């Protein structure tokens, strides 16, 4: 809500760049993207409590392997599409809504993938989308970095480095930053300016939805 309110009231000015980034996909064994030790994953007996046919849904038939269930299926192209599919709907929802982006006219993907058969999502990827102007709204270039570095920090942002993951909307007037979920928006301005902004925030224009 804050992202759209701040954009609509002109705090950012025209936004021509959006960047979102996350660390490499496969470097954490605690997440939902752990690759198999062999490719393709070897067949294993199906647990008695699992209806493997039902679980696969409309995907092509493949032998069961414990690496798929319950969560690591996200990293395999025949079941999921990695962090791009898992996180973009959260991280990039706010700029899509605020900027009224619609469909891109251009898309490009660069990736580094050590998996021989490319059935598992890449360890590093950089995806670029370009969106045409929408009325008075400027054209936008959006980039998704997955283990492919981060945008360069600009002096006017008042920070030394960007966090491990997040999203920024770079405006002609100001730049906005959020985490991977856009509920913690803040302006990238010097600390004193941000503290003053928090003391005197702009009026809310989008009503909260009732809880019941």
Give residue ranges: language-model regions.
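Contiguous beta-strand/loop segments that form the cofactor/metal-binding neighborhood of enzyme cores
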Residues: 2-212
């Amino acid at each position: 809500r804050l992202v759209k309110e701040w954009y609509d009231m002109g705090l950012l000015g025209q936004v021509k760049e959006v960047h979102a980034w996350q660390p490499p996909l496969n470097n954490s064994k605690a997440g939902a993207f752990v690759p198999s030790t062999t490719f393709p994953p070897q067949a294993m007996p199906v647990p008695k409590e699992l209806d493997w046919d039902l679980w696969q849904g409309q995907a092509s038939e493949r032998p069961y392997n414990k690496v798929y269930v319950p969560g690591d299926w996200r990293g395999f192209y025949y079941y999921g599409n990695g962090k791009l599919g898992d996180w973009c709907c959260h991280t990039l929802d706010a700029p899509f809504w605020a900027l009224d982006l619609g469909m891109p006219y251009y898309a490009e993907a660069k990736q580094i993938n050590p998996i021989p058969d490319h059935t598992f999502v890449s360890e590093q990827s950089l995806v670029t989308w370009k969106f045409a102007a929408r009325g008075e709204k400027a054209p936008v270039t959006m980039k998704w970095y997955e283990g492919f570095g981060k945008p360069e920090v600009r002096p006017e942002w008042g920070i030394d480095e960007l966090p491990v993951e997040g999203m920024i909307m770079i405006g002609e007037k100001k730049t906005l930053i959020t985490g991977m979920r856009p509920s913690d928006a803040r302006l990238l301005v010097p600390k004193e300016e941000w503290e003053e902004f928090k003391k005197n925030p702009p009026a809310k224009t989008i009503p909260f939805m009732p809880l019941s």
